[in-house]
Amino acid sequence: MYLYQYFVDLQNQLGYIQKKLTEYLLCIQQSSDVQINTRIGEKLNEPIFARDISQYAKKYIIKSDDDDRMYPLNESLILDFNYTNTTSKYYRDVIHIHGSLADPKTMIFGYGDELDENYKKLSNLNDNHYLKYIKSIRYLESGNYRDMLRFINAAPYQIYIMGHSCGNSDRTLLNTLFEHENCVSIKPFYYQKDEENDN
């Protein structure tokens, strides 16, 4: 009984944190004027260069040894892990995988490392109440995850990582993207604040 009550209390606390985070982000989003960085828009529309494609993928996709050859993008998609509308200022086709501030009920807040042993223990309890804040359970409640799968299954793709830590909280989803047979390249970007600090 104690363990069950512990999880109930923990989930209530997570619900409270989610509510406060939503209030804070709505306030920030309404009060800030996002400065558009044109270099980000340029990167999003770049073709895929042969030199960026993994050696594994080159065996199946490229029949040329020309590393400077470019492959134009047939389709682009932003998979946004943020709740705000910032990415929609750069691009029209955006999947808010964790939901959006535009509809706070869709927001997915929690943890998503199904590869962790503790997840397996919770799952084996056969009580979905324990899984309320597990992201992959919530992904099934919207079409966003299915839309993402449809995109990555359709054709070879390149991933640009901007502003994401690639931490454990999204480990399972990132594993799906990074290890997919259509993923030909992963390019992480970071923001250089000054000579000593980056983000």
Which functions belong to the PLM regions below?
Residues M148-N199:
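SIR2/sirtuin-family catalytic core signature
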Residues L140-R150:
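A short, well-structured beta->alpha microelement
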Residues M1-S142:
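Extended, H/D-rich, highly charged conserved domains that either
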Residues L131, K135, Y145, P156-Y160:
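A near-ubiquitous, low-amplitude feature marking generic local secondary-structure context
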